[in-house]
């Protein structure tokens, strides 16, 4: 530790790296808590506090060095970005995708079901007449693939995606058919 404290550049680098690690843990813990992964969040919070105490101690022992304060602040902002990127890659949870289409002849519900998605659909009436409304629940890691697939089939579709708070029963109670969802390529999907 004395090697780090004796070299101002190593001190700045150490504070930056420690704060990136701390805030990454903080961001992940917050996201895990919001998504209901309480035990994983508790483990991450343990690591978070360990890293925080070390980093804060280093900064507090050398507050007279402005570069250390800047390294701490810069590490904080980068840590948020890193934490969010990790969460994007993990893609925890599910997404509900609502689709409104005027193209009945495309048989969008059947095409999506053939690809492994659970689809609930009904008819609604908008300003310009009859519309097909679809509601599709998918694991978040397949959200963009599903949206790309819908755009391939019906480029005029109106699409809204959001995260549900709770899921009970239905298609997903029987088990997610992730294997089938992974197997197709969106470039190979064609409309009828």
Curated annotation (Swiss-Prot):
It is found in: Cell membrane. Its main location: membrane. Keywords: Cell membrane, Membrane, Transmembrane, Transmembrane helix. The chain crosses the membrane at residues 8-28, 40-60, 66-86. This is UPF0316 protein SSP0880. The keyword Electron transport does not apply. GO terms for cellular component: plasma membrane. Pfam families: DUF2179, DUF5698. Signal peptide: none annotated. It is a multi-pass membrane protein. InterPro entries: DUF2179, DUF5698, UPF0316. CDD domains: YitT_C_like_1. Belongs to the UPF0316 family. It comes from the Bacteria. It comes from Staphylococcus saprophyticus subsp. saprophyticus (strain ATCC 15305 / DSM 20229 / NCIMB 8711 / NCTC 7292 / S-41).
